[in-house]
Amino acid sequence: MFLTLIAAIISFMVSAFTMPYFIKFYQLKKIGGQQMHEDVKQHLAKAGTPTMGGTVFLLVATAVSLLVSLFSIKNTQSLALISGILSIVVIYGIIGFLDDFLKIFKQINEGLTAKQKLALQLAGGLMFYFLHVSPSGISSINVFGYQLPLGIFYLFFVLFWVVGFSNAVNLTDGIDGLASISVVISLVTYGVIAYVQSQFDVLLLIGAMIGALLGFFCFNHKPAKVFMGDVGSLALGAMLAAISIALRQEWTLLIIGIVYVLETSSVMLQVSYFKYTKKKYGEGRRIFRMTPFHHHLELGGLSGKGKKWSEWQVDAFLWGVGSLASLLVLAILYVF
C-alpha cells in the first residue's frame, strides 16, 4: 500500500509538472489542435486547444509503474502481470497516437478509418490474449462468484471486452474533465478490489495511473487547456478491461463503467433508431437530442424542458452516476 501511494504521488507530481511544457511546446510549434463539433456551439471556442495530452500521462504512469515495481517486486509472476496490463495500455496508446497524428499533423480529419482502427485494436487484443491471458490458463468468466466456462470462446470475449471498452471511453471523452475523472473513479474502485484480493502489483499500477490522471486533470478541467486525445482515451479503456480480467471481476466493469456503457449505448440506439425510422417513415428520427449522451445533457438536461446544462453540471451528474455505481459493486462484493 505504501508503494502504491509513492507511485501515485510521483506520477501526480511528474504529470502536473510536465503538462505545462507539453502545452507550451504545442502552442509554440503552432500545431493544429482539437476540432470541435459544430452542433454544440458552446464548444466552438475550444477549437485549437492542444490535444494528445494522454501521451504525457501514459508515459509517466508506465515509467513510474515499471521503476517502482522493478525495485520493489521480486515475484516474477507479479512482474509478468504488470507487464501484461501495461502492454495493452501501450499498444492501444500507440493506436490512439497514430489516429491523433493523422488528424493533427497530416490534416486527415477522419484519422484512421473505422476499419483500420478496428483491425489494429483486434491485433492488439490478440497480442494481449496470446502473450498474457492464454498462458495463465484462464478460460472462464467470474459472474457473481460462479465460473462460466467459455473455453476457446474466452478469446472472443477478451477481444470484445478490450476493444469495446476502449472505444467506450473514447466516446466518453467529449467534454472537459469527464473521461479523466470518470476513469479515476473506476480505477479507485478497482484499487479497492485489488487491495482486498491482495493483488498489490495491480494496485501499484492503478495508483500510478490515478496520480498521472489527476496531474493531467489540473489542466483538463473546464476550461480545458489540453485534451487527452485518442492516445489517452483508447489506452485507458483498454486498461480498465485488462484490469477487470486480471482481477477476475469482468462483470463488474459493466456497472463500474456504467458511464461508458451509457455513452456507447446512446450512440448505438440513436444510429439504429434513425436507420429504422428512415426506412419505415422516409425520414430519420432521433431518441436523443445528440449523442454521445453527455451532449444530450448539454443540450437540455435530463428532461429537455429546462435550460442547457453547463459542462460542470454534466460532469457532476455523470461522475455521481459513476460513483454510485462503483459503490454498488463494492456493496455487492463485500457487504451483501
Swiss-Prot record:
Q: List the membrane topology term(s).
A: Multi-pass membrane protein
* Record EC number: 2.7.8.13
Co-factor(s): Mg(2+)
First-tier enzyme category under EC: transferase
Q: Name one GO biological process term.
A: peptidoglycan biosynthetic process
**Entry's Gene Ontology molecular function annotations:** metal ion binding; phospho-N-acetylmuramoyl-pentapeptide-transferase activity
Q: Which UniProt keywords apply?
A: Cell cycle, Cell division, Cell membrane, Cell shape, Cell wall biogenesis/degradation, Magnesium, Membrane, Metal-binding, Peptidoglycan synthesis, Transferase, Transmembrane, Transmembrane helix
According to UniProt, this protein's pathway is: Cell wall biogenesis; peptidoglycan biosynthesis
Annotated TM spans = 3-23, 53-73, 78-98, 118-138, 143-163, 174-194, 200-220, 226-246, 251-271, 316-336
Quote any Pfam family the record assigns: MraY_sig1
Q: Where does this one sit in the cell?
A: Cell membrane
Reactions that this protein is recorded to catalyse: UDP-N-acetyl-alpha-D-muramoyl-L-alanyl-gamma-D-glutamyl-L-lysyl-D-alanyl-D-alanine + di-trans,octa-cis-undecaprenyl phosphate = Mur2Ac(oyl-L-Ala-gamma-D-Glu-L-Lys-D-Ala-D-Ala)-di-trans,octa-cis-undecaprenyl diphosphate + UMP
List the record's Gene Ontology CC terms alphabetically: plasma membrane
Q: Which function does this protein serve?
A: Catalyzes the initial step of the lipid cycle reactions in the biosynthesis of the cell wall peptidoglycan: transfers peptidoglycan precursor phospho-MurNAc-pentapeptide from UDP-MurNAc-pentapeptide onto the lipid carrier undecaprenyl phosphate, yielding undecaprenyl-pyrophosphoryl-MurNAc-pentapeptide, known as lipid I.
Q: Which PANTHER family match?
A: PHOSPHO-N-ACETYLMURAMOYL-PENTAPEPTIDE-TRANSFERASE, PHOSPHO-N-ACETYLMURAMOYL-PENTAPEPTIDE-TRANSFERASE HOMOLOG
What family is this protein classified in? Answer: Belongs to the glycosyltransferase 4 family. MraY subfamily.
What's the protein name? Phospho-N-acetylmuramoyl-pentapeptide-transferase
